């Protein structure tokens, strides 16, 4: 018995030693990674206010930027927050499907599927932008334009889900005619405004750049959240008992907090150079936007299950199909806008280098 116990302890000790060596083994298994550099060693385009170090050097092979997912630099938290959020969305939706709650053959399910697609799209586009933008100036513009297309798609995917599953009758009777066309236009305008601001203004960025980004995105949010905000307000005034309404409330609160950190460079403004790797405002923005999306997903899944009869009373298959088709039209228009401005950026960079 004593011998068996000692053998087991020896095995556990060896396992502990192997676990402690795991980070070193992983590091040795990866290609040799260039060290990060200070802001003075990267072009002006890549520098962020109050972030003094942790930049990845430009001009390396694509492999380096993909493997930088496992390197300590000033974008890695931005990448991982949205990577983990995308995995969480997929796992939560998979659990929902496994529970038998999804009606695959029903038009009732299409807006939910598009919302899941839009959520994964914006999270993936965002993490790719932060992971790969450092390769070159053209890559920087290209991947951020892709990011803006993802945001536009997510805005309209949210609008579809809120319209079909979450709106109450009083709001629906007032706004049903023009809500989706207006949401599609605001989604495209948000993408166009962000792409134009990125193309037009150079560092150090003027206030007008932030206005071009924030105002269209703010309009899109106010419109897209209006069915939810109306329902949540009425619910809380009546002593809210709906679980979905509480998740919608969290969604709104998390988004407002994330919007603040997107708009204001805090806390790095007050601690320059101390938040280079962890703790700067854009990372906090990513974290709150991720939990906003997860709260929104929970609310929409509850509405999908609990408000099925309301959906059937309001919407026929044709209206659902046409609304869902508009999702792909918006995605195409946003992608075309981003592509056009990318060509303009490419021409400008060619002229600069010639």
From Swiss-Prot:
InterPro entries linked to this entry: AdipoR/HlyIII-related
Main location, first listed in the record: membrane
Tissues where the protein occurs: Expressed in brain and testis.
Transmembrane spans: 77-97, 112-132, 174-194, 214-234, 244-264, 284-304, 316-336
GO biological process: oogenesis
Protein purpose: Plasma membrane progesterone (P4) receptor coupled to G proteins. Seems to act through a G(i) mediated pathway. May be involved in oocyte maturation. Also binds dehydroepiandrosterone (DHEA), pregnanolone, pregnenolone and allopregnanolone.
Protein name stated in the entry: Membrane progestin receptor beta
Species the sequence originates in: Mus musculus (Mouse)
Gene designation: Paqr8
């Amino acid at each position: 018995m004593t011998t068996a116990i000692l053998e087991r302890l020896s095995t556990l000790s060896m396992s502990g030693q192997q676990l402690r060596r795991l980070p070193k083994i992983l590091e040795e298994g990866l290609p040799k990674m260039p060290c990060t550099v200070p802001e003075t060693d990267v072009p002006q385009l890549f520098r962020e206010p109050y972030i003094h170090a942790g930049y990845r050097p430009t001009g390396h092979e694509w492999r380096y930027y993909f493997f930088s997912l496992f390197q300590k630099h000033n974008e890695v938290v931005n990448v991982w927050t949205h990577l983990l959020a995308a995995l969480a969305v997929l796992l939560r939706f998979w659990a929902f499907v496994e529970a038998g709650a999804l009606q695959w053959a029903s038009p009732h399910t299409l807006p939910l599927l598009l919302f899941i697609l839009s959520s994964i799209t914006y999270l993936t586009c965002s993490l790719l932008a932060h992971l790969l933008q450092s390769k070159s100036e053209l890559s920087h513009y290209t991947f951020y334009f892709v990011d803006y297309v993802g945001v536009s798609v997510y805005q309209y995917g949210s609008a579809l889900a809120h319209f079909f599953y979450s709106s109450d009758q009083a709001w629906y009777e007032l706004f049903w005619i023009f809500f989706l066309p207006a949401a599609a236009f605001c989604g495209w305008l948000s993408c166009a405004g962000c792409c134009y601001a990125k193309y037009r203004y150079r560092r150090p960025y003027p206030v007008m750049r932030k206005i071009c980004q924030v105002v269209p995105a703010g309009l899109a949010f106010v419109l897209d959240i209006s069915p939810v905000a109306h329902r949540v307000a009425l619910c809380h005034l009546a002593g809210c008992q709906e679980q979905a309404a509480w998740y919608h409330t969290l969604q709104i609160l998390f988004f407002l907090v994330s919007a603040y950190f997107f708009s204001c460079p805090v806390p790095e403004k007050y601690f320059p150079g101390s938040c280079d790797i962890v703790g700067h405002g854009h990372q906090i923005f990513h974290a709150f936007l991720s939990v906003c999306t997860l709260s929104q997903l929970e609310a929409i899944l509850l509405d999908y299950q609990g408000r099925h009869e309301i959906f059937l009373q309001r919407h026929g298959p044709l209206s659902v199909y046409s609304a869902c088709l508009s999702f792909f039209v918006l995605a195409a228009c946003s992608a075309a806008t981003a592509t056009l401005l990318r060509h303009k950026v490419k021409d400008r960079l060619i002229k600069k280098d010639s």
